[in-house]
Amino acid sequence: MLATIDPIALRLGPISIHWYAICIVSGLLLAVYLAQRLAPEKGINPEHILDFILLAFPIAIVGARLYYVIFQWSYYSQNPSEIFAIWNGGIAIYGGLIAGAAVLYWFAKRHAIAVLDFLDIAAPGVMIAQSIGRWGNFVNQEAYGKAVSQLNYLPEIIRQQMFIDGSYRVPTFLYESLWNLVGFSIILGLRYFNKGLRQGDVTSFYLIWYGLGRFVIEGMRTDSLMFVGLRVSQWVSISIIILGAVLLYFRKQRQKADYKMKN
């Protein structure tokens, strides 16, 4: 049996660099690279992407942490010093998405960029960043599912890391990481093979795909707050699925109306 992975990847004197941070930053850098490559297609200056990230990233981290702390308040109210210990894990993706989306809306309006265009070029990078970021949960042994008798279908390193509190745990981090990776691949395929993609289509796909996957996977987890029979994140998932479907519907209706006007 292998030992569990040390959450600290590198120690430089008093400075500790955590795997969690490496996963988040790696995903962020890849997302920025992709968005900058896609920006010219929408007539957006690639320099705006970096300006946006420098503003949005810290706010998104605060939003993600705040969301997590609010829904784990029973613990943090008794351990207030832990509220800022983000290196130990404990950030909620939905909190980061909500905060990041708010900043994106403000930034797009300020720089006269169509919000849906900005979202369309951001969505692929966000999805692959989420896929990479889930491996930070793996190292920290968090965001896992119920206890199971064995995980023989997985590599030894994953099985050992998912042996928590005397039991193997369902590796929900892995399921979500793979789900997001598949979603990212589909977006690339749609962009390559379907030249008829309209404004907002990629954003709609992202919202529906991510929401569906998160709804199912969240139901496997054991560490989420319940509300009216479902986990809070499942309610948020339902909301973004509906948002994605409504956006797709109205974009298609507008497309039909435009076609009729031209003919």
From Swiss-Prot:
* Keyword Cell membrane carried by entry: yes
Q: Which domain of life is it from?
A: Bacteria
Main localization, broad class: membrane
The pathway it acts in is:
Protein modification; lipoprotein biosynthesis (diacylglyceryl transfer)
Q: For this chain's UniProt record, which GO biological process terms are given?
A: lipoprotein biosynthetic process
Q: Which Pfam families match?
A: LGT
Stated membrane topology is: Multi-pass membrane protein
* Annotated localization: Cell membrane
What's its top-level EC category?
transferase
Q: What does this protein do?
A: Catalyzes the transfer of the diacylglyceryl group from phosphatidylglycerol to the sulfhydryl group of the N-terminal cysteine of a prolipoprotein, the first step in the formation of mature lipoproteins.
Q: Which NCBIfam families match?
A: lgt
Name of the featured protein: Phosphatidylglycerol--prolipoprotein diacylglyceryl transferase
Q: Species name for this entry?
A: Streptococcus thermophilus (strain ATCC BAA-491 / LMD-9)
